[in-house]
Amino acid sequence: MNVEEAEQVELTVGAVAPGGHCVARHNGQVIFVRHALPGERVLAEITEVHTGFLRADAVRVIEASPDRVEPPCPYARPGLCGGCDLQHVAPEAQLRWKADVVREQLVRLARLPEPEIDALGVRVEALPGGTLGWRSRVRYAVDAADRAGLLKHRSHEVVPVQRCLIAHPAIQELPVLSGSGARWPQAEAVSTVASSTGEVTVSTLADGTATVVQGQDEVHEEAAGRRWQVPAEAFWQVHPAAADTLTETVLTMLAPVEGERAWDLYGGAGLFAGALADRVGPTGRVTLVESAEQGVTAARENLGDTPGVEIVAARVETALARRRITGPVDLVVLDPPRTGAGAAVVRAVTAAGPRAVAYVACDPAAFARDVRTFGEQGWRLAALRGFDLFPMTQHVELVGLLTPA
């Protein structure tokens, strides 16, 4: 018999799945359960009914996993904030959870053989700083009473919160949330930034326009041996250790040498392009491609005077298809958005004939799909590292090295 929304059922929880869920089954129906752990027996409340599957929240734990802990945040509960998926999971178990998701996607979507995945040694590494107080950029939604808060899972409903424990301490101290008495009339969201150089910015967002109410519209970040100027609303990694960790990993995998030519695709403010330029030197060449106006502006401010760096303002797909970037290339960095690079970009990159590609990914599924396309072009995934850039959440960052087979 089928179950309905808001109905409660007892479930034995199975393996982890993408999205911060575990898989369970009830009367032949697949149920994706939040706030649960593999092997647990839980009472789950059905939250969504779809053709072919259901969604549910574990509202009571009957038999707990040894990896279960008490969430440090009072809002990381069923029906409340949807930001942190894994606060009920011990930190070491969170790393295993994410590695299991990565492995499953490589099997299912990349279609890599099990021995090949075993050889990669798939694991997720913790970054310095612990699991709380790491998020240097937080965007709060604003409710109908003008209070800033966070969204429920898969909902536009705002949960007014007194504090966000994963936010950087400098952000936690800001009088932004409802506990401080702050109200934000006419604002759709409040954006906060705490940079690595100690700068703090608060902006309101309405109708697609950001208005700075505290600090400056640009902040400075220090990473990869450089000082970067970045618009407050432009993309920059949210974990304080992320930029250095990713840059070091990309350089180690690619091993650039003086005189080589490199492409930095989806280059943003220029983090990887700057690091590559330092390695290939004045006799080398680095071409950065970025479509976001703020990213292009930042890249030109940061790297405009760096010898051998060319900045192309265009969508990566367009730049490749219309041959706005041409000539021999030795190395490529791909750092696409969550949707991945896509088949057309992968085919164009492999056709250009580089000796190696470093792929930086924030979504294991998109990464795995692109790895499959690389394989169809005669390339292989030669190395893979995973990093926990987003503790307490389902998200994981990957850096893969792809080379001609």
What is the predicted function of each stretch?
Residues 1-334, 339-347, 353:
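Accessory RNA-recognition modules of RNA-modification enzymes
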Residues 145, 403-405:
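Short loop segments at secondary-structure junctions
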